[in-house]
């Protein structure tokens, strides 16, 4: 059985998230998803939704076999516990694949690191960004300052 890990924030689920998870699931037989804890999201605005709610929504998606919230201090701890064959990175995620491979090797994990394919918008007003969804909600409600 080929175990695949996908990871991310998964705040305000959109078609890009679904595509990423479908692509990741196609890389193996069992898809594990690790959701970044709110306090660990430092490269963008923190998630709007709580950790458990984001996990529960992701767990309900068809391609996902298991979903868990990441470790508060060591982002590789859940990966060690899962012992995957593949880590699937989102096509636009900021992660350095070579650095991940080096850390996996240092921890004795034999795991491939692959990038998911991009998902292009299928129609003019399709929104493929959680931040863009939040901005659109605020703009349509006339409140640009949360």
UniProtKB/Swiss-Prot annotation:
Which keywords belong to this entry?
ATP-binding, FAD, Flavoprotein, FMN, Nucleotide-binding, Nucleotidyltransferase, Transferase
Q: What class of enzyme is it?
A: transferase
Q: Name one GO biological process term.
A: FAD biosynthetic process
**UniProt: ATP binding residues:** 9-10, 14-17, 92
Cited InterPro entries: Archaeal_FAD_synthase, Cyt_trans-like, FAD_synth_RibL, Rossmann-like_a/b/a_fold
Q: What are the names of the required cofactors?
A: a divalent metal cation
Q: Share what the entry says about its subunit structure, partners included.
A: Homodimer.
Task: Output this protein's name.
Answer: FAD synthase
**Species assigned in the record:** Halobacterium salinarum (strain ATCC 700922 / JCM 11081 / NRC-1) (Halobacterium halobium)
């Amino acid at each position: 059985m080929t175990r695949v890990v996908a990871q991310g924030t998964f705040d305000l689920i959109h078609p890009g998230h679904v595509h990423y998870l479908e692509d990741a699931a196609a890389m193996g037989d069992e898809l594990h998803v690790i959701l970044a804890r709110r306090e660990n999201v430092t490269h963008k605005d923190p998630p709007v939704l709580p950790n458990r709610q984001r996990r529960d929504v992701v767990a309900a998606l068809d391609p996902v076999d298991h979903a868990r919230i990441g470790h508060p201090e060591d982002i590789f701890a859940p990966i060690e516990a899962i012992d995957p064959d593949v880590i699937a990175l989102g096509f636009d995620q900021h992660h350095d694949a070579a650095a991940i491979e080096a850390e996996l090797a240092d921890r004795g994990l034999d795991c491939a690191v692959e990038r998911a394919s991009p998902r292009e918008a299928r129609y003019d007003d399709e929104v493929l960004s959680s931040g863009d969804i939040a901005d659109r909600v605020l703009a349509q409600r006339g409140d640009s300052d949360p």
